[in-house]
């Protein structure tokens, strides 16, 4: 998800849809967690545009996620350590830690890390322009601490929330700490703010079924499927 031209939230395979110019304008990447579908494009992105930029690309994530990237991707075995090249004092990549509750302010926009409940350390993000807010839950299952915070966001306009499994796979959703439509309905019942709700993280082979079940279980909240290249103004 691209915020304006310079902030990216997660870096999955969809980043490949961006042009070289668009990639080069991104200064900050806020990661929700370390799973491959959320970090896969970072190595190629840094390698592609690092030499075109006059400052490092900054990765923001919880300490556990940054440690995984250092140890398992940017380790010289899988990919070069771009936090050390071309030189340690002028690298292509730099790491910055963020914890739940921390807010980073970038050109009057605020990015705040939200609690997530997943199988690895993870966060969601609250993006606040000052005029409006968008909440992206990231990968999560049942998450009461999230709603306690979201319900205090007075200018909330959009909520993007995952639903990774259909109802017949509820047990798998519980084990893997995701949501299915019946669980989504239980979570949305905790939302006390008015917001447009969009569904993400749908499995490609189950999109139609899952969205049908979402309509049946949570239709009163009017959730819609997040579309490629969808634009939100806030």
Task: Name each model feature, range by range.
Residues 122, 140-144:
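Anionic-ligand binding region
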Residues 1-34, 40-54, 145-152:
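Pre-active-site segment of Zn-dependent metallo-hydrolases
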Residues 24, 91, 109, 154, ...:
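Structured loop/turn residues at beta-strand edges in well-structured enzyme cores
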Residues 1-5, 106, 126-130:
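Active-site beta-strand termini and strand-to-loop segments that position acidic
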Residues 9-12, 27-37, 60-62, 135-140, ...:
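Active-site neighborhood of phospho(di)ester-bond hydrolases with catalytic His/Asp-centered motifs
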Residues 143-231:
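Cap/insert and terminal regions of metallo-dependent hydrolase folds
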Residues 1, 10, 33, 69, ...:
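Divalent metal-coordination and catalytic microenvironments
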Residues 64-122, 130, 220-233:
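Metallo-beta-lactamase
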